[in-house]
Amino acid sequence: MQWTTPSYTDLRFGFEITMYIANR
């Protein structure tokens, strides 16, 4: 799965940060 959509990348990045903070 390789999406080059900036919005998708931003969403995925934000999701990763959210999960990181939630797993702290």
UniProtKB/Swiss-Prot annotation:
HAMAP family: PQQ_syn_PqqA. InterPro entries: PQQ_synth_PqqA. Pathway: Cofactor biosynthesis; pyrroloquinoline quinone biosynthesis. Belongs to the PqqA family. Keywords: PQQ biosynthesis. There is a cross-link at E16-Y20 (Pyrroloquinoline quinone (Glu-Tyr)). One of its GO terms (biological process) is pyrroloquinoline quinone biosynthetic process. Required for coenzyme pyrroloquinoline quinone (PQQ) biosynthesis. PQQ is probably formed by cross-linking a specific glutamate to a specific tyrosine residue and excising these residues from the peptide. This is Coenzyme PQQ synthesis protein A. It comes from Burkholderia cenocepacia (strain ATCC BAA-245 / DSM 16553 / LMG 16656 / NCTC 13227 / J2315 / CF5610).
